Amino acid sequence: MATSKLKTQNVVVSLSLTLTLVLVLLTSKANSAETVSFSWNKFVPKQPNMILQGDAIVTSSGKLQLNKVDENGTPKPSSLGRALYSTPIHIWDKETGSVASFAASFNFTFYAPDTKRLADGLAFFLAPIDTKPQTHAGYLGLFNENESGDQVVAVEFDTFRNSWDPPNPHIGINVNSIRSIKTTSWDLANNKVAKVLITYDASTSLLVASLVYPSQRTSNILSDVVDLKTSLPEWVRIGFSAATGLDIPGESHDVLSWSFASNLPHASSNIDPLDLTSFVLHEAI
């Protein structure tokens, strides 16, 4: 147990240091690259630079609440909410062939009144700039049932087993389909703060997602190769989407903070600020 606790503490420290380093590197290349960055430690009603869709609201306490709840805080069935950063992100450039590296960090909680009846989950995603809410429940508001023409790259935190899912709650990487290309088990904790770091290294096309529960001393990590040029348009929006169950409340989803930075190098720049990120993340475990 002592070893497990120490490893988790090391993960938390390493992820925090990694995010700080990544954000500094990404935002220091303004003269040689196209950069976008922001950091919100909490939210405010009528949050600037945010587009809310569906049931999403910002509460008076500063939480981004993605799903409807009743006066007692119990989640309501068939709720779908999304929140987008309003500024489009130039994720790759057709003229130069360059692809952006990025880092996203956020804290979130989910609350389920009955942990034996969970549904459906939350996702961080990149999608076309005109993206609209899609099918709710198991499709998490990201995909249509026929999945025709969907251009979405997402990291999902999925609590309900649909026909295309593994048997347990999981973290998945999704590329233009609700069927994840790779998953790992999610040691979820009800109503506890989860710290998430998602990075994309353009030099290797490696997408890495990690989740840590500091209070529970547990962590999960997942990675796979994703080609953003073949999966997404040149310009995208980023954001969150979360859904409750069709016939059961399942769980509500709240985002507590959110930071993001991206770097699209020009053709003359051969410096990739994330070339060590995946190594640091893997070495932290």
From Swiss-Prot:
Keywords: Glycoprotein, Lectin, Signal. The keyword Signal applies. The keyword Glycoprotein applies. Residues 1-32 form the signal peptide. Glycans are attached at N107. It holds the Pfam family Lectin_legB. GO terms for molecular function: carbohydrate binding. Homotetramer. Belongs to the leguminous lectin family. Binds GalNAc and galactose. This is Lectin. It comes from Glycine max.
